Amino acid sequence: MKNLRVVDLSKHIDPSNETRRCKLHRFNTGGPIPDFHTNMDLMSHLGTHVECPYHHNNNWKDVTELPVTSFMGRCVYIEFSDLEPNSYIMPEDLERASKGRIGKGDIVILDSKHKLEPFTEKTNTEEDKRLFICHDTAEWLRDKGVKCVGFGDGVSIENNNVDVCAFHDVLMEKDVVFLEVLKNLDQLKKEVFFLTYLPLPIKGLDSSPVRVVAIEGLAGFEE
């Protein structure tokens, strides 16, 4: 790992205070010889998770029907610093901020300076200044050929059903996956890097908790 920098972009989960379903039952199968196992009762959208097309349509692909390369690759991190609170991210904003760095098969993480933890009671209140996505945002990303879109705390995918549904429709129909509840993006030192986020290979899963890891400085995955 010489000359490489590794950043964990995952939410660490504590079942005692997690708001989404997360229950663990630990038991000893070995009697006098300790042999502990754990039954996990989890929801598929727990913590940092990758959502697959099956999440949005019963006829689209689940986590096992996508190639493993859908869950790793070259990533471009875009943090919008010049857009007003509660603005929509439009194609011209993406063109300007991406600086020609986004191509077919890339991963894109969208973020802004207007940060708020997602999926809380503060969502869509006066405190929520995050940027919005819409149909036009999705079309630009689709036309670029990206394979994954991730979201930092500065971009909302909860503002209204029309925008959120259109965003899913346009991208997931093309087998684009989504990365949600990303953490520690402020620890990144580069805007282009290698990213991996492998799901559990369980047939029928629409989404899976993932350990998202950025590797900076890997040859072939730089600007």
Residue ranges and their predicted role:
Residues 1-223:
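Active-/binding-site microenvironments in catalytic and ligand-binding cores
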